[in-house]
C-alpha cells in the first residue's frame, strides 16, 4: 500500500506547524515546551480521520528533512498506539516508497530496537510541560495492523463527512 503523507514538521524542529484543512495554509501552532525535537519528518495521511478528530499522523523516516507542505509517497512499516487529551492518537511509522536504501525496512521488527525506543520516548514526552496536554500508551504494532488502521481511518472519514 502506497499513500501520500503531507509533511507539516521537518525533522529536528521544535516548531509545531499544522495545515489548516479549510484554507490549506500552514500555521505555526506552537513551539514545543520541552527541548525535544521531532526525530523525523512528521505529517498526516490525506483523506483519513483518526479517533482524535484529525487526519492520521505519520512519522516518515527520511535521511534529510523536507519542508512543511511537501508531499511524500510512503509505505507504512508499523504504528505506535497512543492516546492524547483528545482521544486515540496513533502514529504511523513510514518510509519513502521509492527509497531503495530503506527497502530492508518492511515491518516494525526491521527497525533497530533502540531507534524505536528513541521515537517512542519522543512521543511520550513531547507534550510535557504544556498545560492541559497529555499522552499515554506507547506500544508498537506491525505493518499489517498499521495498514488496517489506515483503512479504518479512510472509512471513518467517509462515514462522518468530516
Positions of PLM-derived features:
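Hydrophobic N-terminal alpha-helices or hydrophobic patches in metabolic proteins across all domains
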Residues: 1-162
Amino acid at each position: 500500500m502506497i499513500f501520500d503523507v503531507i509533511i507539516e514538521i521537518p525533522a529536528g524542529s521544535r516548531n509545531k506547524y499544522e495545515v489548516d484543512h479549510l484554507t490549506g495554509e500552514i500555521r505555526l501552532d506552537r513551539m514545543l515546551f520541552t527541548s525535544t525535537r521531532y526525530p523525523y519528518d512528521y505529517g498526516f495521511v490525506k483523506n483519513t480521520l483518526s479517533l482524535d478528530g484529525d487526519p492520521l499522523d505519520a512519522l516518515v523516516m527520511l535521511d534529510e528533512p523536507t519542508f512543511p507542505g511537501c508531499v511524500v509517497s510512503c509505505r507504512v512499516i508499523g504504528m505506535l498506539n497512543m492516546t492524547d487529551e483528545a482521544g486515540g492518537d496513533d502514529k504511523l511509522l513510514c518510509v519513502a516508497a521509492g527509497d531503495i536504501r530503506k527497502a530492508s525496512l518492511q515491518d516494525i521488527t526491521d527497525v533497530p530496537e533502540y531507534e524505536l525506543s528513541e521515537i517512542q520516548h519522543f512521543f511520550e514526552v513531547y507534550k510535557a510541560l504544556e498545560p492541559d496536554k497529555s499522552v499515554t500508551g506507547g506500544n508498537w504494532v506491525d505493518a499489517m495492523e498499521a495498514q488496517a488502521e489506515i483503512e479504518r481511518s479512510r472509512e471513518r472519514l467517509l462515514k462522518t463527512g468530516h
